[in-house]
């Protein structure tokens, strides 16, 4: 087992990474609080019943899917916590993917004005991205994660054994976020991914441990430098401005998050290439790597139809869009002065990279 530490001004917490570490670490943390509650999906509870020897009265279930990141679910779970006498010294254990983690973190941040929570991500996407850094949130019709808080967990427990039960589609979705780290700040890591596609797809344990740790080191560096996303942390949203728009346009049902981000990264890179920020090789290598991992690279939506969502992006201010565009593999730039009409014109021309 390896351990990293997120070290912030007002909070420090550990990230545990290993194989088959779940049972021991849950037992270690569960009794630290006045009462503990597991927030999870019914199917995960069933699969991990032996590892999670937790009484049913301490389990609260969440439906599968992005639709669960809603005010309705927040109220429902908060009422359950109140009925079960959760107090300010209680803790929530988020056992699931990004939906469970984002929802649980948000509830923990507002229930009784803040209680503790532990992240136990079970998808590759949540293990390398959403469980780290303290972002919580729920969706509304107008966009993804538009309601949320910055609220850090007490600990993050990453047991890569949980990836064994993921569907191939869910697993691949997480790989998009892994590729993102190579694109934004680690050229050597990007080359590693190019050379190890087959072993990563086959879930080779040693390769996976390396991929997850390297991804987390990238995110740790950025979060510690810019906790509240005032500047540097925005680079973690490479591909997400377009990706979130694609998710929202599809009603959060047609695309998984990573699938939408994969298309979003390619759209952003195509835009960067056409505007002279990066060369054609950057675009081609990203496209090739995404295709090797089995991602679709075309958006089914017209860029004009996505602009409604893009303009609500959380990085935007004063009506101005902020986009993260690549300079080269391993380096991106926050760009603020691109006109909406230019984005539409360029991406409409990109037959191979979006519609």
From Swiss-Prot:
SUPFAM superfamilies registered for this protein in UniProt: Dehydroquinate synthase-like
A Pfam family of this chain: DHQ_synthase
CDD domains reported for this sequence: DHQS
GO molecular function: 3-dehydroquinate synthase activity; metal ion binding; nucleotide binding
Cofactor binding summary note: Binds 1 divalent metal cation per subunit. Can use either Co(2+) or Zn(2+).
Chain residues that bind Zn(2+): 177, 240, 257
Catalyzed reactions per annotation: 7-phospho-2-dehydro-3-deoxy-D-arabino-heptonate = 3-dehydroquinate + phosphate
Amino-acid positions noted as binding NAD(+) in the UniProt annotation, renumbered to this chain: 98-102, 122-123, 135, 144, 162-165
BP GO terms, sorted: amino acid biosynthetic process; aromatic amino acid family biosynthetic process; chorismate biosynthetic process
Biological or metabolic pathway of the protein: Metabolic intermediate biosynthesis; chorismate biosynthesis; chorismate from D-erythrose 4-phosphate and phosphoenolpyruvate: step 2/7
Domain of life: Bacteria
Record carries keyword Cytoplasm: yes
Cofactor(s) required for function per UniProt: Co(2+); Zn(2+); NAD(+)
Entry's EC annotation: 4.2.3.4
Keyword Amino-acid biosynthesis recorded: yes
Subcellular location: Cytoplasm
GO CC list: cytoplasm
Keywords: Amino-acid biosynthesis, Aromatic amino acid biosynthesis, Cobalt, Cytoplasm, Lyase, Metal-binding, NAD, Nucleotide-binding, Zinc
Matches recorded under HAMAP family: DHQ_synthase (MF_00110)
Function comment: Catalyzes the conversion of 3-deoxy-D-arabino-heptulosonate 7-phosphate (DAHP) to dehydroquinate (DHQ).
Similarity section: Belongs to the sugar phosphate cyclases superfamily. Dehydroquinate synthase family.
Official protein name in the record: 3-dehydroquinate synthase
Species lineage: Bacteria, Pseudomonadati, Dictyoglomota, Dictyoglomia, Dictyoglomales
């Amino acid at each position: 087992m390896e351990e990293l530490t997120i070290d912030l001004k007002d909070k420090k917490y550990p990230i545990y990474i290993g194989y088959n570490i779940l049972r021991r670490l849950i037992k270690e943390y569960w009794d630290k609080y006045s009462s503990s509650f597991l927030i999870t999906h019914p199917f995960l509870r069933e699969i991990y019943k032996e590892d999670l020897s937790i009484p049913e009265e301490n389990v609260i279930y969440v439906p599968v899917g992005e639709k669960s990141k809603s005010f309705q679910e927040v109220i429902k779970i908060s009422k359950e916590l109140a009925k079960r006498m959760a107090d300010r010294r209680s803790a929530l254990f988020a056992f699931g993917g990004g939906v469970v983690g984002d929802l649980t973190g948000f509830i923990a941040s507002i229930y009784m004005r803040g209680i503790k929570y532990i992240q136990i991500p079970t998808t590759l996407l949540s293990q390398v991205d959403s469980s780290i850094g303290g972002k919580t949130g729920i969706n509304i019709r107008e966009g993804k994660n538009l309601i949320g808080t910055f609220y850090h967990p007490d600990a993050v427990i990453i047991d890569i054994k949980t990836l064994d039960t993921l569907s191939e589609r869910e697993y691949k979705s997480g790989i998009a976020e892994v590729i993102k780290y190579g694109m934004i700040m680690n050229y050597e890591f990007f080359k590693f991914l190019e050379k190890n596609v087959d072993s990563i797809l086959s879930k080779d344990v040693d390769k996976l441990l390396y991929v997850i740790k390297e991804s987390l080191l990238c995110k740790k560096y950025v979060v510690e430098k810019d906790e509240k996303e005032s500047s540097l942390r925005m680079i973690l949203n490479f591909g997400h401005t377009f990706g979130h728009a694609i998710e929202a346009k599809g009603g959060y049902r047609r695309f998984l998050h990573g699938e939408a981000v994969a298309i979003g990264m390619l759209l952003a890179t195509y835009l960067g290439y056409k505007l002279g920020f990066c060369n054609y090789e950057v675009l081609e290598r990203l496209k090739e790597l995404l295709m090797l991992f089995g991602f679709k690279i075309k958006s089914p939506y017209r860029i004009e139809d996505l602009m409604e969502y893009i303009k609500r992006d959380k990085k935007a201010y004063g009506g101005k869009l902020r986009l993260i565009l690549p300079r080269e593999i391993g380096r991106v730039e926050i760009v603020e002065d691109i006109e909406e009409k230019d984005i539409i014109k360029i991406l409409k021309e990109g037959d191979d990279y979006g519609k």
